[in-house]
UniProtKB/Swiss-Prot annotation:
Single GO MF descriptor: structural constituent of ribosome
InterPro entries, per database record: Ribosomal_bL20, RIBOSOMAL_L20_CS, Ribosomal_protein_bL20_C
Domain of life per record: Bacteria
Family note: Belongs to the bacterial ribosomal protein bL20 family.
One of the record's GO cellular component terms: ribosome
Name of the encoding gene: rplT
Descriptive protein name: Large ribosomal subunit protein bL20
Function statement: Binds directly to 23S ribosomal RNA and is necessary for the in vitro assembly process of the 50S ribosomal subunit. It is not involved in the protein synthesizing functions of that subunit.
Species for this entry: Cupriavidus necator (strain ATCC 17699 / DSM 428 / KCTC 22496 / NCIMB 10442 / H16 / Stanier 337)
Gene3D superfamilies: 6.10.160.10, Ribosomal protein L20 (1.10.1900.20)
Length: 118
């Protein structure tokens, strides 16, 4: 059986992991064994949190809309129900942005919803 020399491929594989671990603290950024584990764990966190990010942002938008609607004497749940009844098809992301950056337009929507609900 012929001898296999892996100097180039092994170095390339190690370099890829060490480069991915750049900026990590302690031995995690320069010891291959430890860096490999750290990079794997970082990938797991990244995978998990790409899914969690969607939940977190939705919760943030709901909290912002709730705060803005309460300024106009209405709760979030009543407001969202009124939006559906008034057939206003704006998603939570847009409503949240309007509540912060375009208060008059948001107030107009709230008044329109109040008229529909009442």
């Amino acid at each position: 059986m012929p001898r296999v020399k892996r100097g180039v491929t092994a170095r390339a594989r190690h370099k890829k992991v060490i480069d991915a671990a750049k900026g990590y603290r302690g031995r995690r950024n320069n010891v291959y064994r430890i860096a490999k584990q750290a990079v794997m764990r970082a990938g797991q966190y990244a995978y998990r949190d790409r899914r969690n990010k969607k939940r977190v942002f939705r919760a943030l938008w709901i909290a912002r809309i709730n705060a803005a609607t309460r300024e106009h004497g209405m709760t979030y749940s009543v407001f969202m129900n009124g939006l559906k009844k008034a057939s206003i098809e704006l998603d939570r992301k847009v409503l949240s942005d309007m509540a912060i950056h375009d208060k008059p337009a948001f107030a107009a929507i709230v008044n329109q919803v109040k008229a529909t609900v009442a």
